[in-house]
Regions:
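DNA-contacting surface of Y-family translesion DNA polymerases
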Residues: 1-126, 136-152
């Protein structure tokens, strides 16, 4: 239908319907839900094996991205999920829920590697690695202060 026909039938709503049907919607996006997870993933240019240096570098990059995203929204997570997609496009996920929330690179990297060890298959090549933090909570990050032994002398 033409714009004129829609406006004759539906009045002002006809104009909106005409634009919506063409993917045009200039209303501001209202985000009304709270984020439930933060994740990142990386696809390899060519498939790699579990014991490759390239996999380890991608894991570091993905965990770093997750940490930055957690920091940006000031959240910590209790559940870590890894996703591994193999060269044959079969996919496996593994997760662990911790007693306390974490947010540091070291903690997320350590737990990611624990999960990877549980699904490791040295004979299969990997196409993609992903890490997601969920069960998010407001983060009260500890401030670390350097304490000198000589302050009290």
């Amino acid at each position: 239908m033409t714009l004129i026909e829609l406006e004759q039938i539906f009045k002002k709503k006809g104009y909106d319907m005409y634009n919506f049907a063409r993917g045009i919607d200039n209303r501001p996006v209202q985000i009304s839900r709270e984020r439930k997870s933060v994740g990142a993933e990386s696809t390899f240019i060519s498939n790699v094996y579990f014991d490759s240096d390239e996999l380890n570098e991608h894991i570091k990059d993905v965990v770093n991205d997750v940490c930055k995203r957690l920091d940006y929204i000031n959240k910590c997570g209790k559940t870590i999920t890894i996703k591994i997609k193999y060269a044959d496009f079969k996919q496996v996920t593994k997760r662990i829920t911790l007693k306390s929330p974490i947010y540091t690179y070291e903690d997320i990297f350590k737990n990611t590697n624990i999960l990877i060890e549980k699904v490791k298959n040295k004979e299969k090549q990997i196409r993609l690695i992903g890490v997601t933090m969920s069960n998010l909570l407001e983060c009260e990050k500890e401030e670390y202060h350097n304490i000198s032994l000589f302050d009290k002398l």
